[in-house]
Amino acid sequence: FRKFAQYGSAMAPISNWVMRNDVLRKILFSFIGIDHRRQIPEFAQYSFTNWYQNNKNLFTLDKKNSTKVILFPDTFTNYNHPEVGINTYKVLVSLGYEVIVPQLKCCGKPFLSKGMLSKAKSLASENIKILSQIIDEDSVIVGIEPSCLLTIFDDYPDLLNQDLEIKKIINKVMLVGDLIVRDFSKGLPDKLFKSVDRKVLFHGHCHQKSLFGTSKINKLLNLLPSVVVEEIQSGCCGMAGTFGFESEHYEISIKIAKQNLAEKINNQSRDFLLVSDGISCRQQIDHTFGIKSLHSMDLFASLLIDDRLN
């Protein structure tokens, strides 16, 4: 998908017009096995890594934190939703972190999910080589997309035979919300974020839930001023990476979403915001229920008070 996303982004907005054209989309999707009822996320006309290179010197707030954040630019954030990466960057900078965004390869998860281990191993080796050159004692490797970041944490040790370099990297890996909870467990800095005026529902990503549970994302959201947070107690949203895109799985994917999420969402008594950090979860919720859900960093960034960051 990364090559597809790179080309799509380079050719935007033409590529987006093709994806919106029902006839052309059906023809293209028939060749690659995607159900024509699905919509591929629109391709951005710029990548997150390019935005970072062009704008990193514009955000020069006082550095208040000794931790250096190496922000992992996953494929969807980089080429489809750079705004999520930008929002994450702004939130971290506002909290006093030094943030760098390196040019990295795909995490390899798409190849792993299809059993293409040699290709996944090659990508893992390249990423570890790059990361090992820029990491130091004060660094953490932070991910925006749970599935991609947790591929490094959970799968790279087996792919790379538990070598010393990967062990050093693994000890530095965490999701962006986990970092903020770790460093601001007693509360966020005063007058940094506005109050939340709506109830916040959140849906946990399966990979995230299976490894760490949802307690930290709950704690993260509860750091926001005047917030009311409720977790959607459910199983998988039904997307499961590429599973829900595939023609033979589309119907069951939608059934799972409706079975696990419909009652919880439809029974809300008032206006609410829905947060889910997994891109596949957000796509499924949008497609099935017509609700635009947010990454947690989108929510945090929208509440920043400092005009220099908006």
What label would you give each PLM region?
Residues 1-310:
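Iron-sulfur cluster-binding electron-transfer modules in prokaryotic oxidoreductases
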